[in-house]
UniProtKB/Swiss-Prot annotation:
The entry's keywords: Oxidoreductase
Name of this protein: Peptide methionine sulfoxide reductase MsrA
Keyword Hydrolase: no
Lineage: Bacteria, Bacillati, Bacillota, Bacilli, Lactobacillales
Biological process according to GO: protein modification process
Pfam family of the protein (one): PMSR
Alphabetical list of Gene3D superfamilies matching this protein: Peptide methionine sulphoxide reductase MsrA
Domain of life: Bacteria
Catalytic center residues: C10
HAMAP family in alphabetical order: MsrA
Catalytic activity, reaction form: L-methionyl-[protein] + [thioredoxin]-disulfide + H2O = L-methionyl-(S)-S-oxide-[protein] + [thioredoxin]-dithiol; [thioredoxin]-disulfide + L-methionine + H2O = L-methionine (S)-S-oxide + [thioredoxin]-dithiol
SUPFAM superfamilies, per database record: Peptide methionine sulfoxide reductase (SSF55068)
UniProt function note: Has an important function as a repair enzyme for proteins that have been inactivated by oxidation. Catalyzes the reversible oxidation-reduction of methionine sulfoxide in proteins to methionine.
Family per record: Belongs to the MsrA Met sulfoxide reductase family.
Amino acid sequence: MERAIFAGGCFWCMVQPFEEQDGILSVRSGYTGGHVVNPTYEQVCSKMTGHTEAVEIIFDESKISYADLVEIYWRQTDPTDSFGQFEDRGDNYRPVIFYFDEQQRKIAEQSKANLQASGHFNRPIVTTIEAAQPFYEAEKDHQAFYRKNPERYARSSAIRHHFLKENWS
């Protein structure tokens, strides 16, 4: 089993696209990249901990590759926006691909370079690629939010879904 961590704005919106893939064993919402041990949602939202909302994915590489996950990741984000994603603004919503080893780093860097070279966007691809740091699972009510609260999820992700349809369909 392998592990991946991606930050792409509100973690509620990052779970479903990965969870629906064959070979995904689990997707957990949480926090990473900060200086407080085991932060709460309120602490992270205060922008005082340095964490970003992210998802941790455990996957079976015999069924889905890390490169596949990176491609899925791009299609959930606006990779030209470094100060949050869609309606969620600030460092705690910044787009980041976290890597666990040199192979993951190389895959992410090459994928980013390919996206930039494709001309798909007319602005620079600013998503950062950083070494993984401790991941802290978010509170239970944030896990699988899209299933537990479909109406609230739909309202909170409308701008994101419009962008994704316009730019990635």
